[in-house]
């Protein structure tokens, strides 16, 4: 999905060029596009870690609550239309919204330390792949903040086009069965165990972000 691009992906689904698109919660849904309210990673998208400029981890050592983050005046960076924007706004947390579809530019903006972005909030299952594919590959002076988890209700969802009625029924039935049987939970725990261990998830401080 990232390779296709957020806005282009929803456009392709709306025009029925593709039949299925997965993404986080968004206000970009319109027309014949709708989503299945079945979280497909057990809220891992809403389990957030921060990318930060190298050498700034000490700035987060005394953050234990949402109020601490608010008082720090640290500014988060987000792509346009992301659900995070509404959540950050409702919690009076400073943020900047990237106005075009190239959300990956936030990495370079943050690395320069001159564009007003202090951290980039990403889902826990996005962190290590993006670190390898973007940060390490481009030798950006960024790192993963080591001690915090910010958690809100949010997950990847399956988006469909209403025009594909029969196919949509098959997809929805399969996802419901996977949810009820515990297959989604089992898959999540097995597939991302190595990432969870590497990111030291069990020993991080959890801060709940209301949404």
Where are these regions (language model features)?
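Short helix-initiation/N-cap motifs at beta->coil->alpha
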Residues: 1-11, 97-112
């Amino acid at each position: 999905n990232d390779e296709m691009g957020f806005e282009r992906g929803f456009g392709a689904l709306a025009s029925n060029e593709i039949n299925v698109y997965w993404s986080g919660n968004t206000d970009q849904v319109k027309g014949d596009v709708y989503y299945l309210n079945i979280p497909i990673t057990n809220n891992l998208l809403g389990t957030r870690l921060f990318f930060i400029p190298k050498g700034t981890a000490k700035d987060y050592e005394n953050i234990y609550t949402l109020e601490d983050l608010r008082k720090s005046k640290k500014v988060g960076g987000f792509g346009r239309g992301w659900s995070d924007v509404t959540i950050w706004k409702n919690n009076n947390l400073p943020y900047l919204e990237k106005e075009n579809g190239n959300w990956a530019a936030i990495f370079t903006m943050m690395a320069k330390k001159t564009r007003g972005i202090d951290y980039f909030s990403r889902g826990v299952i996005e962190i290590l792949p993006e670190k390898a594919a973007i940060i390490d590959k481009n030798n950006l002076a960024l790192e993963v903040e080591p001690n915090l988890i910010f958690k809100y209700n949010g997950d990847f969802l399956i988006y469909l086009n209403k025009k594909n009625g029969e196919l949509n029924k098959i997809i929805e039935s399969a996802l419901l069965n996977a949810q009820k049987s515990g297959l989604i939970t089992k898959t999540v725990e097995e597939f991302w165990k190595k990432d969870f261990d590497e990111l030291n998830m069990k020993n991080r401080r959890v801060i709940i972000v209301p949404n």
